[in-house]
C-alpha cells in the first residue's frame, strides 16, 4: 500500500483523494501516474522526517518521470533532504540539476545562497576572511537571482544584501 494511503493527517488524506481523482480525470500514462505516486509518497515521508524512505521514493519517481519540469521538483526535494542532513555539497548538486531543468525555482536559489552564506560564516570562524568573501559573494549572487524571480520574498536576504553592500545587481 502506498504511503499516501496510510496517512492519518486530514490534509494529507484530502490531498491524496483530490490527487487520485485528478489522476483519473486527466489523461496521463501509467508511467506518469506511478511517478506521481512515488513523488507524493516521497513528500509524505519527507514531511515526517523519514528521509531514507523519501529518497527511495524520489529516486523511483526520477526513474519514471520524463518531464523536465516535474523532474526539477523531485531534484529540488532531494536537495532539501541533503540540506537537512548537512550534506551541503550533495544538496548543491541537486539544486543545480533542478535549476537546469527549471530556471524559475527561486527556492532552490535561496537554499543555495543559504548554504553559501553558512560556508562563509564557517570561514569567518576558521579565520579565513578571503574564503569568507568568496562564499558571501556567491550567496549574494544566488539571492539576487532568487529575488529577481520572487521580488516580495526573501526579505532577510534583501536586508543582508543592503547591509553588506552587495545589493547592486552586476
Curated annotation (Swiss-Prot):
Question: What's the source species for this entry?
Answer: Anthoceros angustus (Hornwort)
* Membrane topology value: Peripheral membrane protein
Which InterPro entries does the UniProt entry name for this protein?
PSI_Ycf3_assembly, TPR-like_helical_dom_sf, TPR_rpt
Residues in TPR repeats: 35-68, 72-105, 120-153
Which cysteines link up through disulfide bonds? Answer: none
- Leader sequence range is none
Major localization listed first in the record, in broad terms: plastid
Q: Its Gene Ontology biological processes?
A: photosynthesis
Please tell me one Gene Ontology term that the record gives under cellular component.
chloroplast thylakoid membrane
- Family statement drawn from the similarity comment of this UniProt entry: Belongs to the Ycf3 family.
Determine the domain of life of the protein's source. Answer: Eukaryota
Task: Summarize the protein's role.
Answer: Essential for the assembly of the photosystem I (PSI) complex. May act as a chaperone-like factor to guide the assembly of the PSI subunits.
Q: Which Pfam family, giving just one, matches this sequence?
A: TPR_1
Where found, per UniProt? Plastid, Chloroplast thylakoid membrane
User: Could you identify this protein by its name?
Assistant: Photosystem I assembly protein Ycf3
Amino acid at each position: 500500500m502506498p504511503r499516501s494511503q496510510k496517512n492519518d493527517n486530514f490534509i494529507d488524506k484530502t490531498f491524496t483523494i483530490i490527487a487520485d481523482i485528478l489522476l483519473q480525470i486527466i489523461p496521463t500514462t501509467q508511467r506518469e501516474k506511478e511517478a506521481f505516486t512515488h513523488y507524493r509518497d516521497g513528500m509524505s515521508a519527507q514531511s515526517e522526517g523519514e528521509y531514507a524512505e523519501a529518497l527511495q521514493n524520489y529516486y523511483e519517481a526520477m526513474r519514471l518521470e520524463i518531464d523536465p519540469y516535474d523532474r526539477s521538483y523531485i531534484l529540488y526535494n532531494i536537495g532539501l533532504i541533503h540540506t537537512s542532513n548537512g550534506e551541503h555539497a550533495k544538496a548543491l548538486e541537486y539544486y543545480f540539476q533542478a535549476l537546469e531543468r527549471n530556471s524559475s525555482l527561486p527556492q532552490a536559489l535561496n537554499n543555495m545562497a543559504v548554504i553559501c552564506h553558512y560556508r562563509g560564516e564557517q570561514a569567518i570562524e576558521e579565520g579565513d576572511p578571503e574564503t569568507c568573501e568568496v562564499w558571501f559573494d556567491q550567496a549574494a549572487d544566488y539571492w539576487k537571482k532568487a529575488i529577481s524571480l520572487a521580488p516580495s520574498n526573501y526579505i532577510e536576504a534583501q536586508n543582508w544584501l543592503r547591509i553588506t553592500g552587495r545589493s547592486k545587481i552586476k
